[in-house]
Amino acid sequence: MQTEKRKHQRIHIALPVFLKNGTGTTRDVSASGMFFWMAGLCTAGDFIGFEVELRRPVGKMRLKCNGSVIRTESRNSDIGVAVKITDSSMEQA
């Protein structure tokens, strides 16, 4: 039996992700990390910066994050990226 290693609950939600080398869509998000699909290139061990767009009734917000790529996986022409968030901030879009 495998022991669950996650510290925070994951929420399955599709949100737009913006990176320097592409765009993507989240599959799931937690307080300490997220998984997203993107058309671009990332490898395990990379340190990346990215933004997640959050839509609210009164306007958009951007969650700006830095993190380390824990693992990647392939699906057709997309790359799945699991990221551990090291720091983040929220801004009005």
Regions of interest found by a model, annotated:
Residues 18-21, 59-66:
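Short coil-to-beta-strand transition motifs
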